[in-house]
């Protein structure tokens, strides 16, 4: 694939920077830092452009917080001016990374997403009798900066863009030379791109027809157990040698008819069920919502709004009985 150049000038264009602000501010206009930036928008965008043209981007200003959904994760949110920069970079560079992506990579891509990945997995489960479900141990924390930048250099020949990526990546590490922060736009795209190297190896070297990846969760399907066991050994070696990554121990090598755990669902050839962890998370959130309502913190309208967002996840699976119970209890559309 031909490398792409002359990207940095496009990142610096005033029109691109203004578009980056609009994307960064979408749905966040009520936040103080967004309002402060918007109040002096022309001046702030001019400053950002000057910093980029001087090759002195101001990066590395993060706010850290922890979420539990379901496991504990440290989220690293960039300050708003830096989020504008991230959008400016990805406005121009995302199409370059997109051209490298295979069809069956589903994270951080327009027209893809979690539900499309699950439906594709269901189609493969109907075609192939065996599946191999894998995911990477501490994925974001384990990404090697030097290997990531080397992979980017195979796609991009603009030295200024590569330098800017190196500066952004270098602002965060979990150990020397490793780690991308969870919660940043650039990190999400780069993390998805990093495993694109695995995607091409699976499709072009192993020649696996049934394969789906959503970030660091991926599934291979095949005709028999021995074939997939061989792919497992090869995948371990490839990830270690090429990307410096290791697989989690919870390998799932089983018959497709028994269901594959994928993205919170149990995917069978003919139906979708909620996985046990997703059911537990749903129950905990439901109890929390009921408590807010009973204690008067939420109105019925508040309850309905939160319940709709919660039900959108379970509605995708075969959960008619569960949703009928919700309707009977709360009168919420399911």
Locations of regions flagged by a protein language model:
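Conserved two-metal-ion catalytic palm core of "right-hand" nucleic acid polymerases
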Residues: 1-157, 172-173
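Right-hand nucleic-acid polymerase module
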Residues: 78, 87, 171, 229-230, ...
């Amino acid at each position: 694939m031909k490398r792409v150049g002359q990207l940095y000038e496009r990142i610096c264009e005033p029109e691109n920077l203004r578009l980056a602000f609009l994307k960064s501010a979408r749905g966040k206009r009520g936040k103080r830092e967004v309002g402060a930036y918007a109040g002096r928008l022309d001046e702030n965008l001019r400053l950002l452009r000057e910093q980029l043209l001087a090759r002195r981007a101001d990066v590395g200003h993060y706010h850290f917080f922890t979420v539990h959904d379901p496991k504990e994760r440290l989220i690293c949110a960039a300050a708003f001016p830096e989020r504008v920069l991230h959008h400016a970079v990805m406005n121009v560079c995302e199409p370059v990374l997109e051209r490298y992506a295979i069809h069956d990579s589903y994270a951080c891509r327009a027209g893809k997403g979690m539900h499309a990945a699950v439906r594709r997995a269901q189609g493969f489960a109907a075609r192939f009798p065996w599946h191999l479900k894998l995911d990477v141990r501490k994925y974001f924390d384990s990404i090697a900066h030097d290997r990531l930048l080397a992979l980017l250099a195979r796609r991009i020949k603009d030295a200024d863009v590569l330098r800017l990526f190196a500066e952004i990546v270098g602002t965060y590490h979990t150990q020397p030379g490793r780690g991308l922060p969870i919660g940043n736009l650039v990190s999400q795209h780069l993390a998805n791109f990093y495993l694109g190297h695995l995607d091409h190896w699976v499709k072009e070297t192993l020649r696996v027809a049934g394969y789906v990846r959503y970030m660091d969760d991926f599934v291979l399907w095949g005709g028999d157990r021995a074939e997939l066991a061989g792919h497992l050994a090869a995948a371990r070696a490839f990830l270690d040698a090429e990307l410096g990554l290791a697989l989690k121990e919870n390998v799932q090598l089983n018959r497709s008819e028994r269901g594959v755990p994928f993205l919170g669902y149990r995917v069978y050839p003919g139906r979708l069920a909620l996985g046990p962890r997703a059911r537990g998370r749903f129950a905990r959130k439901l109890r929390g919502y009921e408590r807010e309502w009973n204690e008067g913190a939420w109105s019925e309208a508040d309850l309905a709004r939160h319940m709709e967002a919660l039900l959108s996840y379970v509605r995708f699976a075969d959960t008619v009985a569960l949703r009928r119970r919700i309707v009977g209890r709360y009168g919420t559309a399911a």
